[in-house]
Amino acid sequence: VDGWRLDVAADLGQSNEYNHRFWKKFRQVVKKANPNAIILAEHYGDPSEWLQGDEWDTVMNYDAFMEPITWFLTGMEKHSDEFQAEWYGNGDKFFRTMEHNMSKFQRQSLDVAMNELSNHDHSRFLTRTNRTVGRIATKGAKAANENVEKCILREAVVMQMTWPGAPTVYYGDEAGMVGWTDPDNRRSYPWGKQDWELIEFHKDMIRIHKKYECFRSGSYKSIASGSHWICYGRFNKKLQA
């Protein structure tokens, strides 16, 4: 097995003490079988007490990726359950939130954190770009595709491929899939109806991510921000981007 994804891992057991004891033992067994196997936990909030090198390797990166990027680019909560105008386009708030949450990671954990825009638990990022509060039961399936803005999704993909962490594309996002939160976010792949332009854009950004090492393991620096814009850099000893 090359990797383990742990569902709500912090909730295992009846006490925090038991939880940590279990995951320490779990890591010993996993790494003995395969030293390179990754241990990836689903976790909301501060993960630092589990990321000390003897339990999890990293987490699904909600706090230092999915949530702040969604708030900044769309103003929406990741389930499409609310819109907050004070977040929308607020570059300074975005940087402050990101850097606070990134500080909870060890560097090696941040570099491999699972950076998603969408997944099986939350609304599709493209649907969030319509800035409509709702779910499948209240709005219906068709509304998930109304007034969406693919240009905002493309902005998000650029950030996904250049931000610290491991970019992880939820199936169909690259093809322009929409959907409200679970279960509507699990629609069938749109065979024959893919957005090929968007697919090619994803391929181009993935090539850039792979080509330049600074995007995979380089340092990060926020440079400037304003209303609906930000500027940041990635760099290592050989390259700045």
What are these regions (language model features)?
Residues 1-15:
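Active-site groove signature of glycoside hydrolases
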Residues 23, 27-28, 36-182, 210, ...:
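Conserved alpha/beta catalytic core and glycan-binding cleft of carbohydrate-active enzymes
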Residues 2, 34-36, 166, 210-219:
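Surface-exposed helix-capping loop/turn segments at secondary-structure junctions
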